[in-house]
């Protein structure tokens, strides 16, 4: 770092520290690892480079967006908004209510369904429809109920709702049981299935630590077609399942942070930083891997990342 940047950084930190009571933020922390990683990177930069104070608040998408909309400071920022998965929330609070700001610096996300490479190769599983084969479903049936388990996501995930509709519209329900459980359960099941040579299929996405942790492959799906992708979320319609139809792969995603507009008045330096914050899919995969596979604390991983990427952080802070 140059001397001028060092001096500017010191002045910024000291000026913000002088009014530290005004420069505080509560960061929402969803359950998936990538979101936890980004939340702590945001928090590390706020504390170590801006001089503010941070509180981490666990919550699902609905809880975080509702708190940002209220603007009372209960939760100020969502660290990992996947679009169009969470579009029902951004339409309501960003486009219509105008109470939440969505970052203009997204990274690219991709999602689908995966199997371990060994399981896929041994049973010629390459496409989502292969899961409807009775021989494959039998290999994935760990509880003996006659249906193979397919992890579709965690409770509260918009993507889990999409995947529940997909299992129906891909014609899998005669053979497959969609399962919702926390992501840690899925990770443990992947590890266990590999150790025991069992079959397992699961919702997967990039960026994610799973690509570093295990040898997995994403199954093919019909190419994204908006005419075959009509998804209604529970927040918009109580009959969302009946009124949805998804028989195609998801489009590539844009993933970014979002924050309450009230933050601009309460913590302007932090809000300005959020507007410039940017990471890549590779950044997020690497961070998630350190947390999930190497068992590091998210705060420790974030601190190491910020120290290793000081020039990029400087740019986000306008230094």
Regions found by a protein language model. Name each.
Residues 24-40, 61:
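Extracytoplasmic "Venus flytrap"
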Residues 34-52, 165-167:
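Short, polar/charged alpha-helical segment
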Residues 39, 59-97, 188-189, 209-214:
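Pocket-flanking alpha-helical
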Residues 67, 75-79, 151-230:
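Ligand-binding pocket segment of bilobal, Venus flytrap-like solute-binding proteins
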Residues 98-151:
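A conserved helix-loop-strand patch within extracytoplasmic ligand-binding domains
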Residues 111-121, 254-266, 290:
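A bilobed periplasmic-binding-protein/Venus flytrap-type ligand-binding module shared by bacterial periplasmic
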Residues 212-273, 277:
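C-terminal lobe and pocket-closing loops
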Residues 250, 263-264, 271-319:
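C-terminal functional modules
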């Amino acid at each position: 770092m140059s001397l001028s940047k060092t001096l500017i950084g010191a002045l910024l930190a000291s000026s913000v520290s002088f009014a530290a009571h005004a420069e505080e933020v509560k960061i929402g922390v969803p359950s998936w690892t990538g979101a936890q990683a980004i939340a702590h990177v945001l928090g590390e930069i706020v504390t170590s480079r801006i001089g503010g104070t941070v509180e981490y608040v666990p919550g699902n998408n609905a809880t975080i967006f509702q708190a940002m909309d209220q603007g009372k400071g209960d939760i100020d920022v969502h660290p990992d908004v996947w679009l169009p998965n969470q579009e029902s929330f951004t339409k309501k609070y960003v486009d219509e209510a105008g109470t939440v700001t969505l970052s203009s610096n997204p990274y690219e996300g991709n999602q689908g369904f995966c199997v371990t490479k060994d399981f896929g190769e041994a049973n010629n599983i390459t496409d989502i429809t292969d899961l409807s084969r009775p021989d494959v479903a039998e290999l994935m049936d760990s509880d003996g109920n006659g249906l193979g388990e397919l992890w579709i996501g965690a409770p509260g995930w918009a993507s889990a709702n999409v995947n529940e509709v997909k299992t129906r519209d891909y014609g899998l329900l005669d053979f497959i049981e969609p399962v919702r459980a926390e992501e840690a359960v899925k990770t443990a099941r992947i590890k266990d299935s590999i150790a025991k040579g069992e079959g397992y299929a699961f919702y997967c996405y990039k960026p994610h630590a799973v690509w570093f942790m295990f040898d997995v492959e994403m199954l093919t799906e019909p190419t994204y077609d908006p005419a075959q992708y009509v998804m209604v979320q529970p927040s918009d319609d109580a009959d969302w399942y009946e009124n949805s139809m998804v028989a195609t792969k998801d489009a590539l995603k844009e993933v970014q942070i979002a924050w309450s507009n009230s933050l601009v008045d309460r913590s302007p330096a932090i809000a300005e930083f959020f507007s410039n914050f940017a990471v890549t899919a590779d950044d997020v995969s690497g961070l998630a891997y350190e947390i999930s596979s190497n068992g590091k604390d998210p705060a420790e991983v974030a601190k190491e990342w910020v120290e290793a990427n000081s020039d990029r952080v400087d740019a986000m802070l306008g230094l």
